[in-house]
């Protein structure tokens, strides 16, 4: 099957799913009546969700929601974006504040099975790493014994960090922040020795620093982070639409 035929088949599949779901899916009915999709995204992460000087959103996670809007309405602009911190994101979805969460969120068994959520697929496969100032003189994460570590609250990153230091018999002092920009600024200001996050976030945050060349991502990758969109559990019709889009 050539690319054009495959694309046509996928579009047809999605449109059929939308049509058949119109009678059953509560989320879809509410979205159609409202006239737009409510999409939760990150609060400023280049490559995933970021706004330009005119306030226009761009990035992988943004494109996912625009594609879903195109599938439902035939118009990719029928979407409103809500920037959320890591601590806010799951609650916003569970409470119905948003219809879909497309915010570099790790697919874990506990989130998928015990928190009333359904992950629709993987859009980016990541791994957790460490960003340090070169003047610290560190070449490996295994040299970070006794370090102060900036980490974003409400993330799997916190748990992975604890596991890694314990497994390597090292001590550390965590300093938590609600927003990724806050943790990066703390590293830049010298309030912590190292910043830990998904590697994609580390590279994105490094670009935004005043002197990005002064910082380096260490070679260790300490976790596997499959990132993808999330919807509420219990509405299979809406889940299928987001998944197949």
What are these regions (language model features)?
Residues 66, 70, 74, 78-143, ...:
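Acidic, polar ligand-binding/catalytic clefts
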Residues 1-10:
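Bacterial N-terminal signal peptides that target proteins for export
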Residues 41, 57-59, 146-154, 177:
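Short beta-strand->loop
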Residues 25, 63-72, 135-138, 142, ...:
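Extended ligand-binding regions for polar small-molecule ligands
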Residues 24-102:
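Extracytoplasmic small-molecule ligand-binding "clamshell" domains
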Residues 9-18:
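Bacterial N-terminal signal peptides
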Residues 18-24:
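Sec/Tat signal peptide C-region and signal peptidase I cleavage site
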């Amino acid at each position: 099957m050539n690319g054009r035929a495959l694309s046509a088949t996928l579009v047809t599949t999605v449109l059929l799913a939308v049509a058949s779901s119109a009678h059953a899916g509560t989320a879809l009915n509410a979205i159609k009546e409202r006239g737009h999709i409510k999409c939760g995204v990150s609060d400023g992460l280049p490559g995933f969700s970021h706004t330009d000087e005119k306030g226009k959103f761009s990035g992988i996670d943004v494109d996912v929601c625009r594609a879903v809007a195109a599938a439902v309405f035939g118009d990719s602009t029928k979407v409103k974006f809500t920037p959320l911190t890591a601590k806010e994101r799951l609650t916003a979805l569970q409470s119905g504040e948003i219809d879909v969460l497309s915010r570099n969120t790790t697919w874990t068994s506990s989130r998928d099975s015990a928190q009333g959520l359904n992950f629709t697929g993987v859009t980016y496969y990541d791994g957790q790493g460490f960003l340090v100032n070169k003047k610290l003189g560190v070449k490996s994460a295994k040299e970070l014994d006794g370090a102060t570590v900036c980490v974003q609250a409400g993330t799997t990153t916190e748990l992975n960090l604890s596991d890694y230091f314990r497994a390597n018999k090292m001590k550390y002092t965590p300093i938590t922040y609600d927003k990724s920009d806050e943790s990066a600024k703390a590293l830049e200001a010298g309030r912590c020795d190292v910043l830990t996050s998904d590697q994609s976030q580390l590279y994105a945050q490094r670009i935004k620093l005043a002197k990005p060349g002064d910082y380096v991502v260490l070679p260790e990758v300490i976790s596997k982070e499959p990132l993808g969109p999330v919807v509420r559990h219990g509405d299979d019709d809406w889940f299928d639409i987001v998944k197949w889009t």
